[in-house]
């Protein structure tokens, strides 16, 4: 994903609908504090880090929704 194609921004409030392999994260909400890039064999993955817990969300693999856009 190119930087200009990002849908998510620092400050956005999201809800995790489904996190791959982590059912206890379903329904959690939080604010995106940092966005990073992971270089995996499958390609470049965007990772969202925030106030919902210790794990990063990967929008290409996990199901999330923006519930409030940051300013």
Regions found by a protein language model. Give the residues of each.
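Basic/aromatic-rich interaction segments and small domains that mediate binding to polyanionic partners
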Residues: 9-70
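Short, conserved secondary-structure segments in the cores of folded domains
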Residues: 4-7
């Amino acid at each position: 994903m190119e930087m200009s194609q990002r849908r998510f921004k620092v400050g956005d409030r999201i809800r995790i609908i489904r996190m791959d392999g982590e059912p206890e994260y379903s329904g959690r909400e939080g604010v995106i504090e940092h966005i990073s890039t992971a270089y995996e064999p499958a390609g470049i993955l965007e990772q969202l880090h925030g106030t919902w817990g210790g794990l990063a969300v990967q929008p290409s693999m996990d199901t999330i929704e923006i519930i409030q856009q940051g300013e």
